[in-house]
From Swiss-Prot:
InterPro entries in alphabetical order: Leu-rich_rpt, Leu-rich_rpt_4, Leu-rich_rpt_typical-subtyp, LRR_dom_sf, SDS22/Internalin_LRR, U2A'_phosphoprotein32A_C
Region annotation Disordered: where it falls in the sequence: 305-325
Name this polypeptide is given: Leucine-rich repeat-containing protein 9
SMART domains reported for this sequence: LRR_BAC, LRR_SD22, LRR_TYP, LRRcap
Gene that this sequence comes from: Lrrc9
Species the sequence originates in: Mus musculus
Length: 1456
């Protein structure tokens, strides 16, 4: 046998030599020189003969039938080893190859990574195409750079690769990796450059099929150069991944804040209900306390009186006074009896207060539990980049209603009868959309269908909705539930029985799922002796509904463990209910089963249902818990919740004897009053002063009471206790039931032993305790109950820890245990060296995590400093993250040396000031949520700050320049404060997220403070007063901040943006003006200038603030009416040029009964269609003469270039005091609708379409002094006779052709200035002389002044023409004359034949046989008397006059 093996060994070595070009015979000599051997495909079944090659550095064995690694013991120099495509089942035999750098073991049958610990020089390891399930055994391979595990069965990465920090290339393709969270473990590999999870040569991992896979990987591994064989080194790719991830983080941060806000709202409602319910007990307690203190005062006075009488009464009179003493003794006993009864009633009502508080806490706990899953759900969505999605259902969702019906159908009343449960009500249903689990389920389900007989109609019925059974001893914890929802049921069940580890336990009955839990809770609370309010917790439950494929199923066999080994051929096993609980009272038990499903992937979690049981109320108490909510109204007490006999008993106690008569209340205190109360004249003898039950607010004149030891000032009106500082001997002070808001000034009371400050308004825990600690060093008893303290949860420990002399606090004895706890508590309220070591991290970079947690919290959880870190030099400067949340700090100290601190969190402490951070100049993120800070200060040097969160503080405002130096601030969260203004944020241009919900922002002006923040994309202002003050608040904000992507936790839709533009586009509001001015003091404003701003409406509210505005310029906007301007009371000048004014008031919609032609005329009056009807309609419908006047102070109105067609619709008649009206550049064709403007002095209608004036244009006498009609279409000048005061008339650039039209101007005797240039008639120069002659008062014509020479020349011209025209007329008269008057013969009708040129006299032709009568000629007065009124010259004849005039003028010049 040995010889055979040696023979085979020799043949193998021969084959080895042959394949590598070596001679077998001399291999002993050649072997030492050989450094590389290769064997491919066959001929080398075992690794033998390598001892001949001592210097071998590379060995390659491929496709051999080798089953084990051996024979390498002598290969000490081996650096590269290939044993691929063989049959290796185990990694072994490599311990001696310590110089190995490259190891290739791919395409084998290896199932475990092992025996590599000593290969510390290994750089390349290929184990692809094996059967490896876990990544392990690589801890010591510190130099590993290339790892290939593709084509294996790896399902999880875990933390196994953390030690391999030098890893640069990693291939995990073709495995079973499913989780994004698992991939984040690779972030520790900072040198990783090449990652493959989806190599084309292998099957992809399931995680690669998820949405946003590449984005997730590139964000978490920014140093990657290649991903899945693709080059991803481009900067743009990395920036896109980072941008997408940051958007996701911001979005989910917003969603989480919304969830927290909703929870706070619910808690606030509960607190309001609690306060309402506590109102009656508190009132009763105050009433009884007042009566008690009154009786105690009477009793003390009675004792003093009795003592005084016994001391001063002579012996002879003592028997006489025995009756008096007896009566006083009886009275004292009655007082004591009544005091005892009053104490009992106070105890009773205090008990009611405690009951209310207990139920309130239970309700708060339940609310928090209900909302407790929502935030983890959102974080899971973020971490999985939306591949696990949770959706809360409503009644509009079919699946929500289906779940409700399923719960009700699986509920049997008989099962819950023993627990007093009568029904179940679904409170919430959350749908789970897990993409990876669904893909697994569908894949397995399809495989089952392929293997089974799919023709079986019952096979599909094996899909069932069942309830998952949690361990009753382990309540449904968030972590466990989240693991199931994220990873499925595999390895998530922590139950104790072994069968539950192998199979998933499910039931189809609510009772089978819930009854074990209820019984366990009842037993637990019974053992712990909890009150009934605690046992109410079982009323609320959570059910996980899963979709289950039962497949081949059989009933479980008795007394046989349920596991896969006992049931190898089935998918599931079921146990009927009657086998579990045999005593039943209804038949539904026979339909109830418990199922055990072996394949975890065939159980898909789909719905989480939160429900509440309705119960029979068995215990009558202050609250009715049948509805599981605190009752809303205090009046419920009178309805049986507080029995009427209790209230009657109160009255009976108060009416008990003795009934003390009320004393008159003191309003002020003086020496006389003090003396009368103390019943002594010596101040130093006054040791007790009772001022209970008065109306005092000051304690004057107490300085002389140096011996005062006891002072009672309860039930007064004090807001501070400054006046007691000089009472150095005071030992007892009762200041309860006042309005004390601060103890500032409360000092020097070193002998004070008893202090009662209950029922006041003290809030600032730290400050008030400091005062007491400093100035009441002997205090033994302290009562501070019923004050609105800021941090009530830690108040007792804080007081006990600081006031070490106390023996009683709030009526309770302070135990030693409490003292020790308080001292421990106080010791932790200061930042010490140990504190810094325990809560800090030295990581220099924030880990790339998809999380909304503060960076300080993330870093300190991942990597905390060790307790011995301080032994290293300069350890303070190495701290980069500090998380001191919930440490009960009262101040920030000892951070001066943390010069490199980047991320800090101080949430949920007792901080009242921002101090101690000035030296942390590298701070990038600061969180101060849940403190008592009232002012942001001390951050001006923190120029690198990018995130600041100060939610749930007492901020009342933001200082103006607080954020000016924060040039990198991206996120600011100031929720739940008392901020009223955002003006300090005007220069925070880098701000991206702003959360300022639940503050006191009330006016629109604050939104304008944010308009300059162009980077702001998320804004949350929910719960501010502005939401209710501003109608359409959401659209208002969207319009003014167009860059926003989300508002108040809701994404902004495109339709909302459009609606916002429609609602608020072009609105001139008070807020816009205030934004431009920088203030809202409009009373001093006199001018409003807002041009070219696309304004459509004006809405200035309140109008009274604009009462001094006199000039308004809204030129070049989009106004269609005067809008809100009509309400401005004192506007004198209004400029609305270049708008679209249709009417003073908004124009009504066109009436449907108008014809199409009439509608056309309304739009284009020049069309002529429907003119008559429409004009009449307008007059009837508008009736502006009868409308009341508006804007009575308006004097100047500019409406140029508005496209105005119809002046009647404009309703200008309502502007009764208008003096100057400018209508140039419109489309006006008729001057009308101005009759009531009786004081109008100037009218400008230049550049319109006026052809003529109708009868109503100037029908009434007018005060018009100036009329501009240039650039119209005038051909005639009729109907101007009412313009009796007109002084200036501008008619340039019209179409006046006939001089007869100019004649009509003589009806305006007051005319002093006239322009007619640009008219056709101006081509004939005679018009100037005609106008000068006809208008004797005219002073300027066409811009040229008229002097006396002009008038002389005009008269000379027409006198010279008189004779010539007379001869012409005589020569053309007929031979037969008519009878004429003696002084003048009446001219015959005739017409002159025109001359060839108007400036050339020419020769006249004969008169036509049928002359036409000519009327309305305009001639000089001297010439007209010869021709008569009906004679008119043609334009041709005018040429003769013109030529004669020019010749005469030329002659005159020559003579001169």
């Amino acid at each position: 046998m040995i010889e055979s093996e040696n023979l085979n060994r020799g043949e193998i070595i021969k084959e080895l030599c042959l394949c590598n070009g070596l001679t077998y015979e001399i291999v002993g000599q050649e072997g030492s020189d050989t450094s590389k051997l290769e064997m491919f495909f066959s001929g080398y079944p075992r690794i033998v003969g390598l001892s001949l090659f001592h210097n071998l550095s590379s060995l390659t064995i491929v496709a051999q039938d080798i089953r084990e690694i051996s024979g390498l013991e002598t290969c000490l120099q081996l650096k590269e080893l290939w044993i691929a495509e063989c049959c290796i089942e185990k990694i072994e035999g490599l311990q001696g190859c310590r110089n190995l750098e490259k190891l290739y073991l791919y395409y084998n049958k290896i199932s475990k990574i092992e025996n590599l610990e000593k290969l510390i020089k290994l750089e390349v390891l290929w184990l692809n195409h094996n059967m490896i399930k876990n990544i392990e055994g690589l801890q010591t391979l510190k130099n590993l750079k290339d790892l290939n595990l593709a084509g294996n069965l790896v399902s999880s990465i875990g933390r196994c690769l953390d030690p391999n920090e030098q890893l640069e290339k990693l291939n995990l393709s073709g495995n079973q990796i499913t989780s994004f969270k698992d991939l984040t473990n690779l972030t520790k590999l900072t040198r990783l450059k090449d990652l493959c999870l989806n190599d084309p040569q292998y099957k992809s991992n399931p995680v690669c099929q998820l949405c946003n896979y590449s984005t997730h990987v590139l964000y978490h591994l920014p140093s990657l150069q290649r991903l899945d064989t693709f080059d991803v080194s481009a900067k743009q790719i990395k920036e896109l991944a980072d941008s997408t991830a940051m958007k996701k983080i911001m979005y989910y941060n917003m969603r989480i804040k919304t969830v927290q806000r909703h929870l706070n709202e619910e808690l606030e409602k509960l607190n309001d209900r609690k306060c309402k319910l506590q109102k009656l007990p508190e009132e009763r307690i105050k009433l009884f306390n007042f009566a008690k203190k009154t009786l105690e005062r009477e009793l003390a006075e009675l004792k003093i009186s009795s003592k005084g009488q016994s001391d001063t009464t002579p012996e002879a009179e003592k028997p006489r006074n025995s009756e008096v003493v007896t009566q006083e003794s009886v009275l004292q006993q009655k007082i004591l009896t009544k005091l005892s009864a009053l104490d009992d009633r106070v105890t009773f009502w205090n008990k009611k207060l405690h009951e209310i508080e207990a139920i309130y806490r239970t309700e708060v706990k339940q609310k928090k539990k209900t909302h407790g899953l929502l935030t983890p759900f959102l974080l899971t969505e973020l971490e999985t980049v939306g591949n696990i999605h949770f959706e809360e259902g409503t009644q509009a969702d079919d699946w929500f209603n289906s779940c409700c019906e399923l719960i009700l159908s699986r509920f049997c009343t008989w099962d819950f009868r023993a627990y007093g449960i009568t029904g179940v009500k679904v409170k919430r249903v959350i749908k789970v959309n897990n993409r990876i689990l669904r893909l697994k389920f569908e894949e397995k389900f399809q495989k089952c269908l392929d293997l089974e007989d799919t023709q079986d109609p019952d096979y599909r019925k094996m899909l069932e909705c069942l309830f998952y059974v949690f361990d009753p001893e382990v309540t449904v914890k968030k972590k466990h539930l989240l693991q199931i929802l994220e990873r499925g049921f595999k390895d998530s069940d922590t139950s104790k029985p072994s069968l539950k580890k192998e199979a998933v336990t499910l039931v189809n009955s609510l009772s089978m799922c819930e009854c074990p839990r209820i019984e366990f809770l009842q037993q637990k609370y019974k053992e712990e002796k909890k009150g009934p309010s605690e046992s109410e917790l079982y009323r609320h439950g959570t059910i996980l509904i899963a979709k289950v494929f039962l497949g081949q199923s059989i009933q479980a066999r008795d007394q046989e463990p349920i596991n896969k080994a006992n049931y190898p051929m089935v998918n599931s096993v079921f146990v009927p209910q009657r086998h579990v609980l045999r005593q039943r009272t209804c038949d539904c038990g026979y339909r109830q089963y418990k199922w055990f499903v072996f394949d975890h992937d065939l159980v898909l979690p789909e719905y989480i249902v939160e429900f509440e049981y309705t119960t029979v109320v068995k215990v009558h108490s202050l609250f009715s818990t049948s509805n599981n909510v605190i009752l809303e109204e205090g009046k419920k007490y009178s309805e049986g919740l507080v029995f009427s006999q209790d209230l009657k008993f109160d009255d009976e106690v108060l009416k008990m004897e003795p009934r003390i008569k009320p004393r008159p209340k003191l309003i002020s205190l003086d020496e006389k009053t003090i003396i009368s109360l103390a019943k002594t004249n010596i101040y130093s003898h006054i040791v007790n002063l009772n001022l209970h039950g008065n109306s005092l607010s000051k304690l004057r004149d107490l300085a002389k009471l140096t011996g005062l030891r006891k002072l009672n000032i309860s039930f007064n009106e004090f807001t501070c206790l400054d006046d007691v500082y000089h009472l150095y001997n005071l030992e007892y002070l009762d200041a309860s039931h006042n309005h004390v808001i601060t103890l500032e000034g409360f000092r020097g009371l070193m002998k004070l032993k008893h202090l009662d400050l209950s029922w006041n308004q003290l809030k600032k825990t730290g400050e008030e305790i400091n005062v007491l600690c400093k100035h009441t060093t002997s205090l033994l008893t302290l009562d501070i109950q019923h004050n609105p303290w800021q941090k009530p949860a830690t108040l007792r420990l804080s007081v006990i820890g600081r006031l070490k002399t106390l023996t009683h606090l709030d009526g309770l004895v302070i135990s030693e245990e409490e003292t020790r706890a308080a001292l421990k508590f106080i010791s932790g309220t200061k930042i010490t060296q140990l504190t810094l070591l325990q809560h800090s991290s030295s990581k220099e970079e924030r880990p790339r995590m998809l999380s909304t947690w503060p960076s300080a919290k993330i870093l300190t959880q991942i990597s905390k400093l060790g307790p011995h870190f301080h032994l290293t030099g300069n350890w303070y400067s190495k701290i980069t993250a500090l998380n001191l949340d919930g440490q009960h700090l009262f101040e920030i100290t000892n951070l001066e040396k943390l010069e490199n601190l980047k991320w800090a969190s101080f949430s949920n402490n007792n901080l009242s000031k921002m101090e101690g951070l000035e030296s942390c100049v590298n701070l990038e993120e600061l969180t101060l949520d849940g403190n008592c800070i009232s002012k942001i200060e001390g951050i001006t040097r923190l120029t690198k700050l990018s995130r600041l969160s100060m939610n749930n503080n007492l901020l009342t405002g933001l200082e103006k320049h607080t954020f000016d130096n924060l040039l990198h601030l991206h996120s600011l969260s100031l929720e739940n404060n008392r901020i009223t203004s955002l003006s300090a944020l005007q220069k925070t241009f880098t701000l991206i997220e702003l959360y300022i919900s639940n503050n006191y922002i009330a006016v629109n002006q604050e939104i304008y403070n944010l308009k300059g923040l162009c980077n702001l994309v998320i804004l949350d202002m929910y719960g501010n007063i502005i939401i209710w003050n501003q109608e359409n608040y959401r659209f208002f904000v969207i319009f003014h901040l167009p860059e926003l992507k989300a508002l108040d936790g809701v994404s902004i839709e495109t339709s909302e943006t459009e609606t916002a533009k429609d609602l608020f586009g072009g609105r001139l509001t008070s807020d816009m003006i205030a934004e431009r001015q920088g203030h809202s003091n409009f009373i001093q404003m006199q001018e409003l200038n807002w041009t070219s701003s696309a304004i459509r409406t004006v809405d200035l509210i309140p109008v009274d603030h604009f009462r001094n505005v006199s000039n308004v310029n809204l030129q070049n906007n989009n106004l269609t009416s005067f809008s809100g301007l009509i309400y401005l009371p004192n506007v004198k000048v209004l400029c609305l040029n270049y708008n679209h004014i249709e009417s003073i008031m908004p124009r009504l919609k066109p009436q449907t009964h108008l014809s199409s032609r009439q509608l056309l005329y309304q739009k284009v009056p020049s069309s002529g269609y429907g003119q008559q009807g429409t004009s009449k309609l307008n007059r009837d419908s508008v009736g502006s003469e009868n409308l009341p006047p508006i804007m009575q102070s308006l004097e100047v109105l500019h409406l140029g270039y508005n496209g105005i067609c119809n002046l009647v619709q404009l309703q200008l008649n309502r502007l009764r005091n208008l003096k100057f009206l400018f209508l140039q550049g419109n489309e006006i064709s008729q001057v009308e609708g101005l009759d009531n403007l009786i004081v109008l002095q100037e009218l400008v209608v230049d550049h319109n379409r006026i052809r003529a004036f109708n009868d109503t244009a100037f029908s009434k006498p007018s005060s018009l002094l100036m009329l501009h009609l240039e650039e119209n279409r005038l051909r005639e000048l009729s109907k101007l006779q009412s313009l009796v005061k007109l002084e200036k008339l501008f008619l340039g650039y019209n179409k006046i052709q006939d001089i007869t039209e100019l004649e009509k101007l003589d009806v305006i005797p007051s005319l002093r200035e006239l322009t007619v240039y640009g008219n056709p008639i101006c081509r004939k120069m005679v018009h100037r002389h005609v106008l000068i002659f006809r208008l004797p008062n005219l002073q300027m014509l066409d811009g040229i002044p008229i002097n006396s020479d002009d008038r002389a020349k005009a008269e000379f011209h027409f006198s010279e023409l008189q004779a010539k025209k007379s001869s012409i007329i005589q020569n053309n008269l007929p031979t037969s004359k008519s009878s004429l008057p003696s002084h003048l013969q009446t001219p015959l009708p005739c017409k002159f034949v025109p001359v060839t040129n108007s400036t050339d006299g020419g020769s006249f032709c004969h008169v036509k046989a049928s002359p036409i009568k000519i009327t309305n000629v305009l001639l000089p007065a001297g010439f007209s008397r010869f021709l008569g009124p009906d004679f008119t010259l043609t334009p041709e004849v005018e040429g003769i006059f013109t030529k004669s005039f020019r010749e005469n003028e030329k002659t005159n010049k020559q003579q001169q």
